[in-house]
């Protein structure tokens, strides 16, 4: 490519003025339409000195009106201003969709496009009318141009956060992540997302971006995001969107990263268990049945099972502990409930009765006999109660089942 020479400091020649006037008189649908339409190549092109040979086509910051020769396609561009308005940039970007893909993939053409859109790229990513054109740019971009696009996004983490949390912006970001190939690109994206991960977790669209990182990149890289989530575990777990992202983190975490995240949840189990969203994080790790973890949660909640069993959200955690914990740990919960002075109230509670039924379902031997005996002692208070009679029915059903089994065993023995 011919190296370019600056002409912005001197008065333009008559030939240059003719070229400018010719460009001004040409109807344009967008800034890039001269690349789409057929123009006679400028026979006496002005060559413009660029910051470097590879960036020669980014010389759109000259103050006077300037004609620029694109050597790669033999067509010219015309620019009047040092900065482009958002609406103008939008019109330019929409015109990109009309370009043949082969022409769009030309390195110099791509440099021109990115050079003109760089100040508004983040805003354009959030415009529904520009999404198709931006995706076309991704498809046609080389590794070097994808790196440049990524840099445009991550240099301002406030703007990146805004894009990731936007309906259309989130989709475009996810597509960009799919085009990252080099380790430098991936690491740059991961650390950029890490910086804003707490806010993204608390957004539906932002959560999709984080989940996409988990799908595309290795645990060795995504652990940096999960570590940031662990540091802010309670804040994220108690958010409507955050509790879902936290479960995704638990699913993808490995080894020490998972250990740290679980430790944070367990240490805050008493707070999370009663929370409308936080309880889902506790339920999730209880169902994982990791040795020692459920026993630690049972210990953390000790002394409050009667209260928790009558709580709309916490009762689900108690049920899961009864179902997925070891027998000895479940027995501790059952004994605390039985010896509570509120046991009758628990049986009659809209949520507590399900906890008692789950206890009956998951205990055996002496613990079951003791629990069923205490329940039957309260028969006068339960048989007419809408929730109490459910528990009585459960006890009676299990008793009948055991009697049938005994009868079958006796019949086979004879």
Segment roles from a protein language model:
Residues 1-414:
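Eukaryotic gene-expression regulator signature that favors modular helical reader/repeat domains
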